[in-house]
Amino acid sequence: MSAPARPAPAAPIRVAAGTTAGQAVRDAGLPSRGAPDAVVVVQDPDGRLRDLSWVPDADVDVIPVTADTEDGRSVIRHSAAHVLAQAVQALFPDAKLGIGPPITDGFYYDFEVAEPFTPEDLEALEKRMRQIVKDGQLFSRRVFESKDEAREELANEPYKLELIDDKSGDLESSDEIMEIGGDELTAYDNLNPRTRERVWGDLCRGPHIPTTRYIPAFKLTRSSAAYWRGDQNNASLQRIYGTAWESQEALDRHLELIEEAQKRDHRKLGVELDLFSFPDELGSGLPVFHPKGGVVRRELEEYSRRKHIEAGYEFVNTPHITKEHLYITSGHLEWYADGMFPAMHIDAEYNDDGTVRKPGQDYYLKPMNCPMHHLIYRSRGRSYRELPLRLFEFGSVYRYEKSGVVHGLTRVRGMTQDDAHIYCTREEMRDELARLLQFVLDLLADYGLDDFYLELSTKDPDKFVGSDDMWEEATETLREVAESSGLHLVPDPGGAAFYGPKISVQVRDALGRNWQMSTIQLDFNMPDRFELEYTAADGTRKRPVLIHRALFGSIERFFGVLTEHYAGAFPAWLAPVQVVGIPVADDHIRYLDGLVAQLRALGIRAEVDTSDDRMAKKIVNHTNQKVPFMLLAGDRDVEAEAVSFRFGDRTQVNGVPREQAVAAIVDWVTRRENATPTAELVEISAETGEG
């Protein structure tokens, strides 16, 4: 179990007053341009990243930030975005600039251009970028004296002007804040290294690398349309994506990962394996599961259901819609309205003249299951003897996601959450959280996901309900439980929902990608809002502590993650078809029918391929369909009451006695092995030979 790989923190160095951070780096003999661990910026005592040209007013200790760290890569990528924008305006002089932030594993920049970018355009832009990098242009920070000065300089950049005008108001995202900054309004100029003349510039907070030569490896990956500021009511711009790394080797590894990820894309595999689809007639973000996908989903849910019963959970069911008042009580309409579908106004009655005889009511599709679970808790008096009370539901919820962010099964509008709410006393709280975290980790591991780290999301000071004392107690309790697990804990300041802090279980998949999976959220607020109580041992009425928990996040998302983790080759216990019988000729179908019937009677999902394809073609087809066990039968097999095993890795074991074959398959499936079965792994041996 591990956290994301990261280099060890560098030792502090002293920057003398009146000298640059870069000079201190050189004096310390630290790596410079060209090395993967070259220092690209420094971190000051307040945690702010500073250019190497930064000159402090007083002596100060700083942390060197190298190119092979996440912060270092982010700076390189931000600078690469500037190089891209310069290249675009050189080749497309009429292009207007949007924003260009670093993102996970890369960067993008938005442009207003007359026509969408083509693959040939991206090739030309890459070539121009390489020349800019080779030129070694200097990044130079400049502070505007006033907004008016900035407006005058950027008079021909309408999107930059909009950001300048919004500087004193609410910027929409951290990407925009990166453009504008906090206390000062600044630009970064690219200077000719010989003449120091300004070549190009952009409104930007920074920081940046010293020169363009600090970008050792980059590549433009694709382009797409994107709404300005993510709002579909705004102009549609053209976005170019790219990636940049500390070395060519790191870039090559990343591109290989992208290629493999494309092969594993669950949207592609969903079609190839006939698992699910997204009919246009239903709308964006609303998947349907086909029979094979339905089998996988059923197995996912059934195993989870069984483990929850063993862990003392009680199953409930709640409706898909509710009256408005429920979400007023819960606070969702105040804090989460943007994520809810519009109200349905129903039950109104009208007179013949159209006047209202009886007012209707607003109903909402539920975005969360928790308020309905609270009503179940509140439906009768509760005693401390009933606690902890663990309510669980596979509950359908509906959330409005903008069409631009909907993505396959991992970001949908209609989903099924494996949602649990645990009500306990404060005295039980810590033990229940520790028990719950271990349950989550164990269950995820049962599905083959066992590389974890934890993230602690704390209060957003601008978006929370409840007292500061409640939040502090909840946060510290979660922190103690997370730390006691022995897993690496990463802080997420301001990342909590409005009603309480949470632990997120982050999982690394087979490609080393991180996914947020399970969430455990402590909530002292909802019991007050719903007036939840229990009778304590001394006869007094007390509020229970509430713990929210979604283990898979949603069934749909978990399905998508597992599909990519296993590249569609689900473990045999989850596979939609576990065994396929392949006859050498039609004369052998009847024998395999009997074998398949025997397997089905033992709970194995098995079938016989009776198509007109030749045997070799059938093997290829079922290998591509990721069927874990292929059983071949010819004359010798029928005569000897045997079969030949064929596996996805093309290994084969011939002449396995029928009863031994059945026992081996049943044993493998019932043990819920997550490895792909091979001749080496499955305990079978041949006693006869088909040849």
Curated annotation (Swiss-Prot):
Catalytic activity: tRNA(Thr) + L-threonine + ATP = L-threonyl-tRNA(Thr) + AMP + diphosphate + H(+)
Entry-linked InterPro entries: aa-tRNA-synt_IIb, aa-tRNA-synth_II, aa-tRNA-synth_II/BPL/LPL, Anticodon-bd, Anticodon-bd_dom_sf, TGS, Thr-tRNA-ligase_IIa, Thr/Ala-tRNA-synth_IIc_edit
E.C. designation(s): 6.1.1.3
Binding site for Zn(2+): 370, 421, 548
GO annotations of cellular component type: cytoplasm
Cofactor binding comment, as recorded: Binds 1 zinc ion per subunit.
Required cofactor(s): Zn(2+)
One Pfam family in the UniProt entry: tRNA_SAD
GO MF, one annotated term: threonine-tRNA ligase activity
Subunit structure: Homodimer.
Function comment: Catalyzes the attachment of threonine to tRNA(Thr) in a two-step reaction: L-threonine is first activated by ATP to form Thr-AMP and then transferred to the acceptor end of tRNA(Thr). Also edits incorrectly charged L-seryl-tRNA(Thr).
Protein name: Threonine--tRNA ligase
Species of provenance: Mycolicibacterium vanbaalenii (strain DSM 7251 / JCM 13017 / BCRC 16820 / KCTC 9966 / NRRL B-24157 / PYR-1)
Lineage: Bacteria, Bacillati, Actinomycetota, Actinomycetes, Mycobacteriales
